[in-house]
Swiss-Prot record:
Residues 129-163 have a biased composition (Acidic residues). Residues 165-175 have a biased composition (Polar residues). GO terms for cellular component: nucleus. PANTHER family: RNA-BINDING PROTEIN EIF1AD-RELATED, TRANSLATION INITIATION FACTOR-RELATED. Keywords: RNA-binding. This is Probable RNA-binding protein EIF1AD.
Length: 175
């Protein structure tokens, strides 16, 4: 597999799949980049430590501060305590939250990602009003304001002729 194909594959995988958490996975928030593919994270237990980014993500996916990642702990090493298993985007965060596996310490950040928070609304409706088709009462109200046209009015408009003068054109032959 060429480098470009690998990059495209990883980018599509991160952007399109929902991640299923495994028992030893830890959800963490990226605090800062330490350089050399090392990142400092704050995990769901409140511990702060350094994790490494695996080679499959390097040069194809970039991390931002306060972004969420799934970390798999590693036993060897003194400074590096884990490896990034998956980079969570907004859809994955909301999906894990719906499953009930989202840590309570990051709940406030997950609430900011919901549709209601972005719109500044708080509602318990399953479907937003703007996603529903218009009701019949709204259609009746709109139709009352419209004018109705008779066929006789249309025929009268067609019979009218206008004499216009255009100096750039030759005179039309008379009938």
């Amino acid at each position: 597999m060429s480098a470009a194909t690998k990059k495209r594959y990883i980018t599509n995988k991160v952007g399109s799949e929902f991640y299923e958490l495994v028992d030893e996975d830890i959800i963490a928030q990226v605090r800062q980049s330490r350089g050399n593919n090392l990142h400092e994270v704050l995990d769901q237990n409140g511990d702060s430590y350094v994790v490494s980014m695996p080679t499959k993500f390097r040069k194809s996916v970039w991390l931002r501060r306060d972004q969420f990642v799934v970390v798999r702990p590693i036993t060897e090493g003194d400074k590096v305590k884990g490896e990034i298993e998956y980079i969570l985007d907004q859809d994955n965060v909301l999906y894990i939250r719906e499953l009930g596996k989202w840590p309570t310490c990051f709940e406030e950040n997950a609430l900011k990602m919901t549709r209601e928070a972005k719109r500044g609304q708080t509602s318990d409706k399953m479907i937003d009003d703007d996603m529903l088709p218009p009701s019949e009462s709204e259609e009746e109200d709109e139709s009352e304001g419209e004018e109705t046209y008779d066929e006789d009015d249309v025929d009268d408009e067609e019979e009218e002729e206008f004499d216009t003068y255009n100096p750039n054109r030759m005179q039309a032959p008379s009938k």
